[in-house]
Curated annotation (Swiss-Prot):
One annotated GO molecular function: DNA binding
Taxonomic lineage from the root: Eukaryota, Metazoa, Chordata, Craniata, Vertebrata
Self-association and partners: Component of the transcription factor SL1/TIF-IB complex, composed of TBP and at least TAF1A, TAF1B, TAF1C and TAF1D. In the complex interacts directly with TBP, TAF1A and TAF1B. Interaction of the SL1/TIF-IB subunits with TBP excludes interaction of TBP with the transcription factor IID (TFIID) subunits. Interacts with UBFT. Interacts with CEBPA (isoform 1 and isoform 4). Part of Pol I pre-initiation complex (PIC), in which Pol I core assembles with RRN3 and promoter-bound UTBF and SL1/TIF-IB complex.
The protein's name: TATA box-binding protein-associated factor RNA polymerase I subunit A
Designated gene of the protein: TAF1A
Pfam families per the UniProt record, alphabetical: TAF1_subA (PF14929)
Organism: Homo sapiens
Length: 450
């Protein structure tokens, strides 16, 4: 593997043997394919044009990566290093980043690659592509984190944090903030461990004060590293969660709420469902008024109508005294069950079955018809076919009963799903099925008496 990285220092001269191959200490084999790659056979002619051969080599690498042929990709990669000598200045400047992205992907998945190989490659690429130093350092740190090497990752980030080269640009500033924030995440991890250690100590324990001070020191470092990043528009979920957890731990609930509110509602930030989830969970922990919880989940509903929190949203709406909220509660349940991933959600079907009956008993037929009109052409096949009746009854009789009740209320007693469940002989559910039959007869929206 050391030979793989050594190629980054310069191209091989023309008089080298084309048959030469390299077998690194790590056990990765890299035959020299210069002649093969430089020769693109078309009609028996040989093309030696530099741009054409490097382009062909790049195509070979990409194809090998797509097919997960890591050894073959590594062999082509060995030849692709010649792009560092491209006469086109634009391509020559772009080459280090391309080589880093391709090479790191190969080394990450190659079965004979190891930590030493990746580290050597990363360090060489940082020095060759100085304009990409920060980006490569960050990605290198993430690789180390993936392998559980927290100390090495932290050292890598600290070195990158103090690196100075070239002009200060907005993109460079964001990268530095990102590097500092990931360093903050590592400090947060240490803080979490210290906090756990503190929770196991009695306040009268002689070590308590020392550990408590250690916890505070780590939280201060983490806050300093993360706070700058989360003010920049972007999706910073792990950083926001860590920062808020520490603010809550030290009793700064107002500060935590301000961070989460800005993250969710600042128009400069991209739309992010998690931002509203974090804010909702925080307000819920603080026992915020129902109206606040509803306002947060209402936005989440507009972004992800199938989210699991929509069932909580329905419960909040159902308990509200406002008629518009109770009407929205019905819309939310229908919205959840519009999605294929929710078709087996028995809680959603239970809520809908019970809520439909209550709404119809309360003379709000128009609410149901409004939701059903846009679904009556596809819900019967999507939810209430004969096939689903047999399948649901076989897999989950409780689910089948809830769905059958909804089917009966929406489609009447002639619905095939409803009729199939009605005919089943089940000792435990027998009484429930009889009650369901009476309710459908009385409240179904296809019943003329309504």
């Amino acid at each position: 593997m050391s030979d793989f990285s050594e190629e980054l220092k310069g191209p091989v001269t023309d008089d080298e043997e084309v048959e030469t191959s390299v077998l690194s200490g790590a056990g990765m084999h890299f035959p020299w394919l210069q002649t093969y790659v430089e020769t693109v056979a078309i009609g028996g002619k040989r093309r030696k044009d530099f741009a054409q051969t490097t382009s062909a080599c790049l195509s070979f690498i990409q194809e090998a990566l797509l097919k997960h042929q890591w050894q073959q990709a590594a062999e082509y990669m060995y030849s692709y290093f010649q792009t560092l000598e491209d006469s086109d200045s634009y391509k020559r400047q772009a080459a280090p980043e391309i080589i880093w992205k391709l090479g790191s992907e190969i080394l990450f998945y190659h079965p004979k690659s190891n930590m030493e190989s990746f580290n050597t490659f990363a360090n060489r690429m940082k020095n060759i592509g100085v304009m990409n130093y920060l980006k490569i350092s960050l990605q290198h740190a993430l690789y180390l984190l993936h392998h559980g090497m927290l100390k090495d990752a932290k050292r890598n980030l600290s070195e990158a944090e103090t690196w100075r080269h070239g002009e200060n640009t907005s993109s460079r500033e964001i990268l530095i903030n990102l590097i500092q924030a990931y360093k903050g995440l590592l400090q947060y991890y240490t803080w979490s461990e210290k906090k756990m250690e503190l929770s196991k100590l009695d306040k009268d324990d002689y070590a308590y004060n020392a550990v408590a001070q250690d916890v505070f020191n780590h939280s201060w470092k983490t806050s300093a590293n993360i706070s700058a990043l989360i003010k920049i528009p972007g999706v910073w979920d792990p950083f926001v969660k860590s920062y808020v957890e520490m603010l809550e731990f030290y009793g700064d609930r107002d500060g935590a709420q301000e961070v989460l509110t800005n993250y969710a509602y600042d128009e400069k930030f991209p739309s992010n469902p998690n931002a509203h989830i974090y804010l909702y969970n925080f307000l819920k922990r603080q026992k915020a008024p129902r109206s606040k919880l509803i306002s947060v989940l209402k936005i989440l509903y507009q972004i992800v109508p199938s989210h699991k929190l929509m069932l909580e949203f329905h419960t909040l709406l159902r308990k509200s005294e406002k008629e518009e909220h109770r009407k929205l509660g019905l819309e939310v349940l229908f919205g959840v069950l519009d999605f294929a991933g929710c078709t087996k959600n028995i809680t959603a079907w239970k809520y809908l079955a019970k809520y439909l009956k209550n709404i119809l008993m309360g003379n709000h037929l128009a609410w149901v018809q409004e939701e059903w009109n846009s679904r009556k052409n596809w819900w019967p096949g999507f939810h209430f076919s004969y096939f689903w009746a047999k399948s649901d009854w076989k897999e989950d009789t409780a689910l089948a009963c809830e769905k059958a009740f909804v089917a009966g209320l929406l489609l009447g007693k002639g619905c095939r799903y409803f009729r199939y469940i009605l005919k089943q002989d089940h000792q435990i559910l027998g009484k429930k099925i009889k009650r369901m039959k009476r309710s459908v007869k009385k409240y179904s929206i296809v019943n003329p008496r309504l």
